[in-house]
């Protein structure tokens, strides 16, 4: 599962219902199997567990402070009781290293604005947070991990977006080497 973007939203009845329905889908499975069986009857022979997932990936907005990320992840680990992964951004590398890799080493002509580094967590803030969350997960009998290639804020250089949109968010394969 993937949830976000802030603790208030994650604690909302709608998101809590979604999490509960994925953790225990026994009431919804018969109708879902019937629907899929119309296109693929073999689905009836597949053993589908009622618990579809006990794992959550936390997405937060760019600029979310490390303390808030940690608060949300602790809530998911301790109160909801799910294995939790936190998405972090390549800006953890810092401006010189990230731009050097992206532009010089890999040859991408992409401009990463200074602002992208100003509002995302810094490596020196993220590392202690990750260590504390790993300990929280161990104490709760859960797993904790990070995804280091979430998205990267870059200057809008493509005609796909309106000119008034000054930034766009890069994702996918280009970020894998940065990870």
Regions found by a protein language model. Give the residues of each.
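N-terminal small/glycine-rich loop or linker at the start of catalytic domains
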Residues: 40-56, 101-109, 113
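A structural motif corresponding to the C-terminal end of an alpha-helix
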Residues: 28, 48, 72-82, 125-144
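The feature marks a conserved, polyanion-engaging helical scaffold used by nucleic-acid processing enzymes
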Residues: 68-95, 99-105
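Long, charged, helix-rich clamp/arm modules that form nucleic acid-engaging surfaces
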Residues: 25-31, 35-44, 82
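Structural preference for beta-strand elements that scaffold enzyme active sites
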Residues: 1-21, 28-30, 53-58, 83-87, ...
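Active-site mouth loops of central-metabolism enzymes
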Residues: 54-67, 118, 122
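Residue-level recognition of alpha-helix initiation/capping sites
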Residues: 67-68, 178
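Glycine/Thr-rich beta-alpha phosphate-binding loop at enzyme active sites
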Residues: 90, 94-179
């Amino acid at each position: 599962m993937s949830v976000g973007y802030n603790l208030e939203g994650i604690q909302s009845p709608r998101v809590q219902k979604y999490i509960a329905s994925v953790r225990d889908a026994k009431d919804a499975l018969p109708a879902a199997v019937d629907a899929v069986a119309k296109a693929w009857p073999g689905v009836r022979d597949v053993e589908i567990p009622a618990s579809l997932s006990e794992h959550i990936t936390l997405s937060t907005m760019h600029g979310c402070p490390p303390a808030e990320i940690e608060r949300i992840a602790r809530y998911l680990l301790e109160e909801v009781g799910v294995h939790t992964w936190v998405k972090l951004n390549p800006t953890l590398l810092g401006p010189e290293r990230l731009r050097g890799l992206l532009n010089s080493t890999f040859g991408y002509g992409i401009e990463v604005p200074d602002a992208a580094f100003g509002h995302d967590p810094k490596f020196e803030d993220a590392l202690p947070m990750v260590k504390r969350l790993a300990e929280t997960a161990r104490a709760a009998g859960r797993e904790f991990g990070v995804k280091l290639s979430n998205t990267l804020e870059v200057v809008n250089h493509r005609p796909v977006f309106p000119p008034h949109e000054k930034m766009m968010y890069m994702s996918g394969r280009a970020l894998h080497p940065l990870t």
